[in-house]
Amino acid sequence: MHNPQSRGHNLSQAMSDQTVTNPAAEAQEGEITPDTPDTVDKVENTPVENVENPAEATPGEEDQASEATSANAADLLEQIAALEAAKASLSQVVEERNSQYIRLAADFENFRKRTQREKEELELQIKCSVIADLLPVVDSFELARTHIQTETEAEEKIHRSYQGVYKQLVECLKRIGVSAMQAKGKPFDPNLHEAVLREATNEHPEGTVIEELKRGYMLGDRVLRHAMVKVAAPPEEGSASNTNPTNDVTDV
């Protein structure tokens, strides 16, 4: 049998024999660490680049930068000039359009006023035409009232009936603006009167309307029908003592 102590001794001897010296490890142990004095001197003597203040540009680089800046400035000036020209052109267009708008607005306003006047004139002409056709009816009523003499109660009743119609017609004409002229005793006006007779007389000044033969009418300030009148004329020489005025009546 083997001795246990002898076996343990042999195992320890074998392990110590297998231990090999590592040259690389020994070399690493001999390297200089950052904490060594030589390393500190090298770090202190190493130049440090100035990060905050980079190296100044060379003259060639400055010339290139100046040329680029000049080119950019020239381009900007050209763009500004083009924009100014476009602005002036647009301002001229706006001014022309504004002038056209003002002229169109004025033309439209004139057209509106003209058409309004034409419309009112047409309405007035139609109204005058219709009323003028009714005036002979009014004349007939007035002539009947003047010349008809009723003799019986029945005739008087009929007379009052159609005179009532006449009054309604006259009131209707008044409501739409028709008025009868009052020519007698006024100076003759060719715009209102139509002289159909002249009578030589000393009782009225020359040119005075002495009789209204047919009544004239107006619609507002427009003449619907001229009044037919007899006008006073100066007496002829030697006829002043003539007491019969009908002998001096002459047609116009």
From Swiss-Prot:
Keyword Nucleotide-binding: no
GO annotation terms (biological process): protein folding
UniProt-annotated stretches for the region Disordered: 1-70
GO cellular component, one term: cytoplasm
Chain intervals with Polar residues compositional bias: 1-22
Superkingdom of source: Bacteria
Keyword terms of this UniProt record: Chaperone, Cytoplasm, Stress response
Any Pfam family the entry gives: GrpE
Principal subcellular localisation of the protein: cytoplasm
PROSITE patterns: GRPE (PS01071)
UniProt-recorded Gene Ontology molecular function terms: adenyl-nucleotide exchange factor activity; protein homodimerization activity; protein-folding chaperone binding; unfolded protein binding
Protein's UniProt keywords contain Chaperone: yes
Subcellular location: Cytoplasm
Family that this chain belongs to: Belongs to the GrpE family.
Role according to the record: Participates actively in the response to hyperosmotic and heat shock by preventing the aggregation of stress-denatured proteins, in association with DnaK and GrpE. It is the nucleotide exchange factor for DnaK and may function as a thermosensor. Unfolded proteins bind initially to DnaJ; upon interaction with the DnaJ-bound protein, DnaK hydrolyzes its bound ATP, resulting in the formation of a stable complex. GrpE releases ADP from DnaK; ATP binding to DnaK triggers the release of the substrate protein, thus completing the reaction cycle.
Assembly, per entry: Homodimer.
Protein name: Protein GrpE
